[in-house]
Amino acid sequence: MAEVKVKVQPPDADPVEIENRIIELCHQFPHGITDQVIQNEMPHIEAQQRAVAINRLLSMGQLDLLRSNTGLLYRIKDSQNAGKMKGSDNQEKLVYQIIEDAGNKGIWSRDIRYKSNLPLTEINKILKNLESKKLIKAVKSVAASKKKVYMLYNLQPDRSVTGGAWYSDQDFESEFVEVLNQQCFKFLQNKAETARESKQNPMIQRNSSFASSHEVWKYICELGISKVELSMEDIETILNTLIYDGKVEMTIIAAKEGTVGSVDGHMKLYRAVSPIIPPTGLVRAPCGLCPVFDDCHEGGEISPSNCIYMTEWLEF
């Protein structure tokens, strides 16, 4: 007589216990868990039971559904965002989560499409809906003026998106930058002149001619020439351009922790300098750096008489 094998069915697990265990796992791994992690932790639970529990948690707004290079991720939902996304479907929640993860640098719709694997028409519909709810906003990037990046509505865009103080409506404020250049250099020149007039020994004169970036920043703020609030980082950017022009030199010294203008126990000091050798006229003229110099000749398609760079240089 043949032996009869009887398949023993595991006892049905309580759905609430499964959901609670998944929530516990999500708290253990705040960056998200995969289905494989859930399966490893609960090997006796069948795939269908896991799917039912996960879908229920998603529908109740307790989990966020994310996509990564390794596949789908389940992450515990932020309690603050749970109320905002009430009534939204899973696709809308997914797009919102992708935008949230992008932070204040934002994300293009093309990248949202890649991460969500949703059709572009569906993404555009979701984006308009989220914008109408004031959950997200579209911001034009200075890196690509015809493209918009999306970020959460309450975020201040990163400097890499707006261009910082040097841009207004995606236009580079060259005149404003030039004025700041002149004023920063003037301040350092006056500092150096005061040091020379002190008639002290050369070493003391040299040390007295230096100014910290905080001093320069304070001077510019007191002048009131900027309509936007400038940071020390903005002023250091201007000072760096003066260094590249050979008008200023920088040194870094050790500073006591907490000293105004110091960062991580170091302080940047700047002073105005005179060029050792005056630059030649060829370096100043656009011809010295022109990439089509070899093709330029009178009567040709490229010639000095119709050169826009030469015209601008002569007018300047």
From Swiss-Prot:
Entry-annotated residues carrying N-acetylalanine: A2
InterPro entries recorded: RNA_pol_Rpc34, RNA_pol_Rpc34-like, WH-like_DNA-bd_sf, WH_DNA-bd_sf
GO molecular function annotation: double-stranded DNA binding; iron-sulfur cluster binding; metal ion binding
Source superkingdom: Eukaryota
GO cellular component term of the entry, any: RNA polymerase III complex
Alphabetically ordered keywords of this record: Acetylation, Antiviral defense, DNA-directed RNA polymerase, Immunity, Innate immunity, Iron, Iron-sulfur, Isopeptide bond, Metal-binding, Nucleus, Transcription, Ubl conjugation
Binding site residues for [4Fe-4S] cluster: C287, C290, C296, C307
Subcellular location: Nucleus
UniProt entry tagged with the keyword Iron: yes
One of the GO BP terms on file: positive regulation of interferon-beta production
A Pfam family it matches: RNA_pol_Rpc34
Residues in cross-link Glycyl lysine isopeptide (Lys-Gly) (interchain with G-Cter in SUMO2): K5, K7
PANTHER family: RNA POLYMERASE III DNA DIRECTED , 39KD SUBUNIT-RELATED
Domain notes per entry: The [4FE-4S] cluster-binding domain adopts a globular structure that serves as an interaction hub that connects the POLR3C/RPC3-POLR3F/RPC6-POLR3G/RPC7 heterotrimer to the Pol III core.
Family: Belongs to the eukaryotic RPC34/RPC39 RNA polymerase subunit family.
Function: DNA-dependent RNA polymerase catalyzes the transcription of DNA into RNA using the four ribonucleoside triphosphates as substrates. Specific peripheric component of RNA polymerase III (Pol III) which synthesizes small non-coding RNAs including 5S rRNA, snRNAs, tRNAs and miRNAs from at least 500 distinct genomic loci. Part of POLR3C/RPC3-POLR3F/RPC6-POLR3G/RPC7 heterotrimer that coordinates the dynamics of Pol III stalk and clamp modules during the transition from apo to elongation state.
Binding partners and assembly: Component of the RNA polymerase III complex consisting of 17 subunits: a ten-subunit horseshoe-shaped catalytic core composed of POLR3A/RPC1, POLR3B/RPC2, POLR1C/RPAC1, POLR1D/RPAC2, POLR3K/RPC10, POLR2E/RPABC1, POLR2F/RPABC2, POLR2H/RPABC3, POLR2K/RPABC4 and POLR2L/RPABC5; a mobile stalk composed of two subunits POLR3H/RPC8 and CRCP/RPC9, protruding from the core and functioning primarily in transcription initiation; and additional subunits homologous to general transcription factors of the RNA polymerase II machinery, POLR3C/RPC3-POLR3F/RPC6-POLR3G/RPC7 heterotrimer required for transcription initiation and POLR3D/RPC4-POLR3E/RPC5 heterodimer involved in both transcription initiation and termination.
Protein name: DNA-directed RNA polymerase III subunit RPC6
Organism: Bos taurus
